[in-house]
Amino acid sequence: MPSQPSRELERFSNPHPERDYVVHMDLPEFTCLCPLTGQPDFAHFMLDFIPDQHNVELKSLKLYLWSFRDEGAFHEAMTNRIADDLIGLINPRYLRLLGRWYVRGGITTDVLIEHRQPGWQNPDILGQLPTVRWAQHQPGH
């Protein structure tokens, strides 16, 4: 039976809650609709998080992202919604979500969200996170 889009995110217990470690996910195939024109908008999300007690289950994340393909939303609203839903689900020690929205009308948009649990800090591991590289539009590309 084929999978269907679903807003139901699932989680599982962190197998090593005693340790800070980074989970990196590359999510290159996100699609939703422009709320003004109804035209498709495409984004590449890059997610980094340091789990506390839970991790997000990958198939549910895929189906969750797929569920937005026919929904209209501004880039900033959609990126924040996804971050809020993930934070609400797994309450990570740290989360960073970069939404890299593809060129529309000659403009690229990057939306970066960062969240930390109150009082949590680990500068050593945060220094190991991949550097955010802002999109650079080049004519003809």
From Swiss-Prot:
Alphabetical UniProt keywords: Cytoplasm, NADP, Oxidoreductase, Queuosine biosynthesis
Active site location: 34 (thioimide intermediate), 41 (proton donor)
Superkingdom of origin organism: Bacteria
GO MF term set: preQ1 synthase activity
A cellular component term, taken from the record's GO annotations: cytoplasm
Pfam (any one): QueF
EC identifiers of the protein: 1.7.1.13
Catalytic activity entry: 7-aminomethyl-7-carbaguanine + 2 NADP(+) = 7-cyano-7-deazaguanine + 2 NADPH + 3 H(+)
Chief location bin: cytoplasm
Protein's GO biological process: queuosine biosynthetic process; tRNA modification
UniProt key word Oxidoreductase: yes
Compartments, as annotated in UniProt: Cytoplasm
Metabolic or biological pathway: tRNA modification; tRNA-queuosine biosynthesis
Residues that bind substrate: 56-58, 75-76
HAMAP family: QueF_type1
Xref: NCBIfam families: QueF-II
Role, per record: Catalyzes the NADPH-dependent reduction of 7-cyano-7-deazaguanine (preQ0) to 7-aminomethyl-7-deazaguanine (preQ1).
Protein family membership: Belongs to the GTP cyclohydrolase I family. QueF type 1 subfamily.
Protein name as catalogued: NADPH-dependent 7-cyano-7-deazaguanine reductase
Gene that encodes it: queF
